[in-house]
Amino acid sequence: MDWWSELIDGAPMRDGKSTPSLKRYYRLLNRKFFNGDLPDNVIVRWDADEPDVACTEKRDKDDTTAYVIGFNRKKNPTKSLLLSAMLHEMLHISLKFKDNHGPAFDKGHRMLVKKGAFRKGAVIPDVTLF
């Protein structure tokens, strides 16, 4: 089975659970680029209702670690786009939504660049994230 088929096969949509393959990438990116500091209870899944590439939402207003990252399958047709979008959404979580796309977000993006997140092969062999 190829990468894309494996990622989509049996993916839950709105059941409150992560898509296992997406969650594995979340954990990998968390370790590699966020020092494992992001919460592990984040739900990471395909979302058929997501109109944008991806979106992160709070799952519980009283739990500062409870987030859902939803990805639109059609707007993430490649590994590069999907994992770039995931890093983007993870950066929002790292900032706890205190800075939408302002100076703190820019600083976080520069940190990802410095750590090599967008170098060819940084996450998947022979793939560059954009």
Language-model regions, residue ranges each:
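Walker B catalytic acidic pair
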Residues: E89
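Active-site-proximal or metal-binding-adjacent scaffold patches in catalytic folds
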Residues: M1-S84, I93-F130
